[in-house]
Amino acid sequence: MSTTISTQRGQVYIGELPQDFLRITPPQQQQQVQLDAQAAQQLQYGESLGTVRRLSITVVQAKLAKNYGMTRMDPYCRVRLGYAVYETPTAHNGAKNPRWNKVIQCTVPPGVDSFYLEIFDERAFSMDDRIAWTHVTIPEGLREGSVVDEWYSLSGRQGDDKEGMINLVMSYANMTAGMHMSPPVVLMPTVYQQGVGYIPIAGVPTVYNQGMVPMGMPAAPTVAPQEAPCSEEDLKALQDMFPNLDREVIRTVIEAQQGNKDAAINTLLQMTEEL
């Protein structure tokens, strides 16, 4: 507790000063405005106190307009989001109806609201042939926790939106900032045949593998993200209820609903109604 004594220059405090000494307390309305501004900034970047957005993209299948292979066609997908590139496994002899069912987990940098998807025909003795592509805008509904199952038109040599369709399932989840899906594996320039409508980006190296590969970052120890609980028992039960849906699609829906079985069932029912 402080005491006051008088000197020639006036009164002075001796001892511990009060917490609000020489502080001007802003009015309550101004404090509320500052809190609202901070909350709006967090919502703008889609994150809050140490969390970043993670986008789950399930590349299910495609229905292509033409088989460009001499004897067979082995398609695979490449997804470019920000400065990272992801690839699916090759659907060997997938021809015009390849199925991948590949789940891609990736972080979304601030300001990025879309990704670029390409389909290649894997060649054994020549450059891989780029046969189809599309630009996908990330649906706004994902921010509210919904799961989007859509078919997107593909462009290619047949013309814009005339190369077929591709089925994607997308959802959002949060992960702790600083976690990495996997370290970089391959760094090399992209070389392949150019298709109609493709504009190459000169001077930008491409990083790719069958998982997350952030460009320009050193390798970091892999830390497993905290996934929503998804037991094999729940997965099998839902697979029995929805035999027409792929197992990995069901798993993605359960994880997107944070393990809530009832919410996952409602989402799967909506998906089956749209099929």
Curated annotation (Swiss-Prot):
Entry domain remark: Both ATG8-interaction motifs (AIM1 and AIM2) are required for the association with ATG8 family proteins.
Keyword list, A-Z: Autophagy, Cytoplasm, Immunity, Inflammatory response, Innate immunity, Repeat
Keyword flag DNA-binding: no
Domain CUE, chain residue ranges per copy: 230-273
Domain of life of the organism encoding this protein: Eukaryota
Matching PROSITE patterns: C2, CUE
Keyword Repeat included in the entry's annotation: yes
Protein name: Toll-interacting protein B
GO cellular component: cytoplasm
Subunit: Interacts with ATG8 family proteins (via AIM motifs), and ubiquitin (via CUE domain).
Motif (AIM1): 133-136
Function text: Component of the signaling pathway of IL-1 and Toll-like receptors. Inhibits cell activation by microbial products. Connects the ubiquitin pathway to autophagy by functioning as a ubiquitin-ATG8 family adapter and thus mediating autophagic clearance of ubiquitin conjugates. The TOLLIP-dependent selective autophagy pathway plays an important role in clearance of cytotoxic polyQ proteins aggregates.
GO biological process, one term: autophagy
Tissue: Ubiquitous.
Family to which the UniProt record says this protein belongs: Belongs to the tollip family.
Residue ranges of domain C2 in the record: 35-152
Short motif AIM2, span: 151-154
Segments forming a coiled coil: none
Compartments reported by the entry: Cytoplasm
MF GO annotations: ubiquitin binding; ubiquitin conjugating enzyme binding
